[in-house]
């Protein structure tokens, strides 16, 4: 038998496959799959026979199975059939509120059927409880929440829904949360800059390119029957828990996160990426280290000492060193307000910027929730800041810093808030009384009035139609004799049409004073005669004393003589007006200015009344 051998090589191990039919020539035909032998040679000595190993592997022939790339099609078919069955069951179990419009059913069928959105929920916001009225109830009538599989699925669903609304209802949807390419590139640059800064500071950053577009929330106003659609990814939906926000008061407990393992801690919230997540950022601020204030009498005296010196660093140390409940924090803010009130009352110059930042720094979220005590305190503090420096803390700052803040936090605005703004507008001083400066002032008032729409007073009347509010509004329309808003006369006519015979004395006096300020005497007499009673004696309750004082203070001899000579004062006797001592003095002063002192007319109006 002839054999072919391989000489050993000095170096690394060399594995040689020794196939029997190529080595043993006398053997018969040999099948390749029956026997395979591998021989490994070593570079060590000949005696090291244990270093040589032979590995034999026997394999048996098995029938071929379906390759994995052919099984993919079958698996996808089974998956699609399962999804169709799930959608059929979901459509059967789809709950739509009773007495809902047909448009809601069509939109629901599109979202769950064609677009394949899951976990479909509808909240009926039409049933508004008077004890739980919030901004959510005023958004719309129906709030829809559904889950998408990815951000691309969210975007595609919005596009299809918008096409459907245009085709079926001729309406174009408004969306929040849809980022265009420019916004997305800007967002990526910010995240990259944040990541680089974290690396320089030795911190780990979770802002990776993979997580940039992993979550999304599309809030869509369909503009059809008050329907809003929220399309979220699963993780974002779990984070926001919008169900608890939109659910009625008696059903909120069903959607609360009871599992303590899912409730984020302070460290857990800090670890979650808060990119473009406002609600998560607010939660993080609420759970961070809070500053409480429980100050003993010695601490209060020290705090007052530092505040009077305007040593805000020392005051901050005293407040932060104490701990307690949020009620004590309210007391601390009240002490700060009282100190500022004393300084402003003494007409001392104060640093308004530092005083405002001190109050804001210690206004935590839990403190703000105590609305019964916090918001009146903040209103009084804002009025003091405006009184100390009207140029810095102007009416525009008050609109954003107080009114918009209070409204955005779900608190109800009241009559005193609007009055405070109007008084600030009237106190604002401009370098010149021009028409354009007056228009700028009233733009602030218009923005504020939009916030008070639908709000009522204790008498179930609109806040805008309050007597003091109307007087301040009319005063804000007139700067001097030459500068006034063109809408002044329209406002006066609207007040007459709205109230009619129910005009109060305060409203009449305000109208007369503003017309006298611009010296429109014809309109003034027209208004005065328009409210003359016609039902008989004893019915004239017009403010005669204020009317005569307005005429007398004008100093216009032509107007005064016209009032006296045309017999306007005779209506005092004709309508049996109650002549008070104040009215007697006003009549005497007016007749003295007209040169008719101790005249027959004076005796008829004043002395004749006293003789009766």
Curated annotation (Swiss-Prot):
Residues 1-14 form a transit peptide. It is a peripheral membrane protein. Keywords: Membrane, Mitochondrion, Mitochondrion inner membrane, Transit peptide. It comes from the Eukaryota. InterPro entries: Atp25, ATP25_mRNA_stabil_dom, NT_sf. SUPFAM superfamilies: Nucleotidyltransferase. GO terms for biological process: mitochondrial gene expression; mRNA stabilization. Gene3D superfamilies: Beta Polymerase, domain 2. It is found in: Mitochondrion inner membrane. One of its GO terms (cellular component) is mitochondrial inner membrane. Belongs to the ATP25 family. mRNA stabilization factor specific for the 0.95 kb OLI1 mRNA. Also involved in OLI1 ring formation. PANTHER family: ATPASE SYNTHESIS PROTEIN 25, MITOCHONDRIAL. This is ATPase synthesis protein 25, mitochondrial. It comes from Saccharomyces cerevisiae (strain YJM789).
């Amino acid at each position: 038998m002839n054999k072919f051998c391989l000489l050993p090589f000095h170096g690394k191990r060399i594995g040689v496959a020794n196939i029997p039919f190529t080595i043993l020539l006398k053997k018969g035909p040999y099948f390749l799959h029956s026997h395979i032998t591998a021989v490994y040679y070593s570079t060590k000595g000949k005696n090291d026979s244990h270093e040589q190993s032979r590995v034999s592997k026997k394999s048996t022939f098995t029938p071929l199975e379906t390759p994995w790339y052919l099984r993919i099609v079958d698996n996808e078919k089974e998956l699609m059939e399962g999804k169709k069955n799930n959608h059929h069951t979901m459509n059967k179990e789809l709950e739509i509120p009773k007495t809902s419009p047909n448009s809601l059913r069509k939109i629901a069928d599109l979202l769950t059927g064609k677009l394949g959105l899951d976990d479909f929920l509808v909240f009926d916001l039409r049933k508004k409880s008077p004890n739980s009225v919030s901004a959510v109830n005023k958004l719309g009538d129906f709030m829809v929440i559904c889950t998408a599989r990815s951000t691309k699925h969210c975007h595609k669903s919005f596009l299809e829904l918008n096409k459907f609304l245009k085709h079926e209802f001729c309406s174009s949807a408004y969306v929040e949360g849809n980022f265009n390419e420019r916004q997305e590139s800007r967002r990526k640059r910010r995240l990259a800059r944040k990541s680089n800064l974290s690396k320089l500071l030795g911190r780990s950053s979770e802002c990776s390119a993979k997580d940039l577009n992993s979550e999304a929330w599309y809030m869509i106003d369909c503009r059809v029957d008050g329907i809003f659609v929220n399309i979220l990814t699963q993780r974002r939906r779990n984070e926001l828990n919008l169900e608890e926000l939109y659910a009625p008061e008696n059903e909120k407990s069903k959607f609360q996160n009871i599992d303590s393992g899912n409730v984020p801690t302070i460290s857990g919230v800090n670890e979650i990426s808060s990119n473009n997540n406002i609600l998560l950022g607010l939660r993080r601020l609420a759970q961070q280290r809070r500053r409480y204030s429980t100050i003993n009498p010695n601490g209060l005296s020290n705090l007052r000492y530092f505040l009077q010196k305007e040593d805000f660093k020392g005051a901050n140390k005293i407040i932060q060193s104490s701990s307690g409940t949020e009620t004590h924090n309210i007391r601390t803010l009240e002490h700060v307000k009282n100190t500022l009130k004393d300084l402003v009352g003494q007409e001392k110059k104060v640093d308004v910027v530092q005083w405002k930042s001190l109050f804001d720094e210690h206004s935590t979220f839990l403190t703000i929730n105590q609305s019964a005590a916090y918001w009146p305190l903040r209103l009084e503090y804002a009025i003091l800041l405006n009184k100390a420096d009207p140029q810095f803390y102007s009416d525009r700052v008050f609109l954003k810093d107080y009114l918009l803040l209070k409204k955005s936090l779900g608190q109800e605005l009241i009559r005193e808030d609007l009055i405070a703004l109007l008084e600030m507008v009237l106190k604002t001083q401009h370098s010149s009384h021009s028409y354009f400066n007056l228009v700028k002032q009233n733009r602030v008032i218009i923005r504020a009035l939009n916030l008070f729409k639908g709000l009522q007073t204790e008498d179930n009347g609109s806040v805008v139609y309050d007597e003091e509010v109307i007087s301040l509004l009319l005063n804000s329309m007139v700067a001097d004799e030459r500068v006034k808003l063109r809408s002044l006369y329209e406002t006066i006519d609207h007040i007459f049409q709205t109230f009619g015979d129910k005009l109060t004395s305060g409203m009449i006096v305000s109208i007369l004073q503003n017309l006298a300020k611009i010296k429109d005497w014809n309109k003034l007499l027209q208004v005065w005669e328009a409210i003359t009673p016609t039902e008989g004696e004893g019915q004239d309750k017009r403010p005669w004393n204020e009317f005569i004082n307005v005429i007398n203070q004008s100093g216009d001899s032509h107007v005064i003589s016209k009032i006296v000579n045309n017999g306007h004062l005779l209506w005092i006797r004709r309508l049996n007006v109650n002549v008070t001592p104040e009215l007697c003095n006003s009549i005497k002063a007016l007749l003295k200015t007209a040169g008719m002192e101790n005249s027959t007319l004076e005796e008829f109006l004043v002395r004749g009344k006293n003789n009766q």
